Amino acid sequence: TVYLRGGTYVLNKTFELTEADGGTEDLPVTWRAYPGETVIITGSAGASLSAFEPVSGEMKEKLSPDAQEHVMVADARDLGLGEISFSLSALNLCLEAPLFSLDGQHMRLTRYPNSNSTEDWMHVETVNPNSSTSYPEFKLTDERVLGWSYQESDWLYSSYIRYGWAQGYFHGTLNRETGIVTATDTAYYGSAAGQKPVQIYNAYESLDEPGEWYYDQMSGRLYIYPFADTTRNSTLRMTSSNFDLISVNGASYLNLEGLTVTSSKKDGIVMNNVDHCVIENCTLTSFEGRAVSIDNATYSGLKNSEVAYTSISAIYLNGGDYQTMEPGYDFITNCRIHDTNQYRTMNEGGVKFRGVKNTFSNNEVYNITDMALNF
């Protein structure tokens, strides 16, 4: 057993384990947190909340009365967190943006309305619907949104503008006289006639709930609405490292136990070509990729762990051979899997489960805006 003493380990490259680091059936190798101590492995050094100051002046007045006394701001360039950027994936089906956490609590990019349910979103009438790839138009009638004026170019629209299963993202221009929004990014499936659900991300005036953040792309300033239990010494982390945090390649009888693995633009733990390798009693959160990816595996998997807050699916598992029907005997069991698919909610699923004779059992799966299990 390799014991890791308590503390926060900030990585600047992938921690790699290979065939040489594995064990045997009689003598497996386990990397484990020291009993009674907390081990955090992260790709983000973090920034202290003391670097922020209360919002003031004109920017304070733009916020709702409840938010005015809570929102804080800092120059993002002074925080040492890395570059904050927004982009759209291929076909504009997925938003690519960083994930933030404050003392381990997930934060959410500000949005309006504040709900995952499309029933609560704004419902807008499309204009000149077009069934092919096009720049959709719709009429915005929400008086609150029409009253917002700050940095409209920062806004990102999310909508099921054609099909109820096909979410898309786009920027747009708003004609304030007519309320017509014209997308400046294409909708792959076009748009359909009728009332369609729309949500707006990264609008400053919508910053109105604890745990939300907004980035002013012109000034480079980051605004946050802290949780009630945070202090000046709280730590803000952002997914900034562009590498998988832990990789296990070609190993056998190697286990990871009792670790908290968090914050990367890539994946948390990646296992490939492994046998009898198990992740147990771990907490994995805040990844723009997946928290866990296990491929070409036998008798390997994840158990008794919590996996949450990923931009896409939380877990990928594949083992066994479809052609020969050779079983993988891999597993995901007794895990809590929640709040995944933060920015991709179509054809992804909370868990991607592949292979032959693998087991998904006794798991609690919730707060996922896509299918729970994709297999």
Predicted regions and their residues:
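Aromatic-anchored glycine-rich loop motif in surface-exposed flexible loops
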Residues: S293, Y309-S311, L317
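Structural detector of coil-to-beta-strand junctions
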Residues: T14, L245, G268, R290-A291, ...
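Right-handed parallel beta-helix
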Residues: S252-S263, D275-G289, T298-I312, M325-N341, ...
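Asp-box/WD-like beta-propeller blade repeats and closely related beta-sheet repeat scaffolds
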Residues: G319-D321
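Extracellular polysaccharide-degrading/modifying enzymes targeting complex plant/algal/animal polysaccharides
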Residues: T1-N273, V278, T285, S293
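Short, solvent-exposed turn/loop segments enriched in Gly/Ser/Thr/Pro and often Arg
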Residues: D295, G349-G355
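Catalytic cores of eukaryotic secretory-pathway lumenal/extracellular enzymes that build
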Residues: Y316-L317, R354
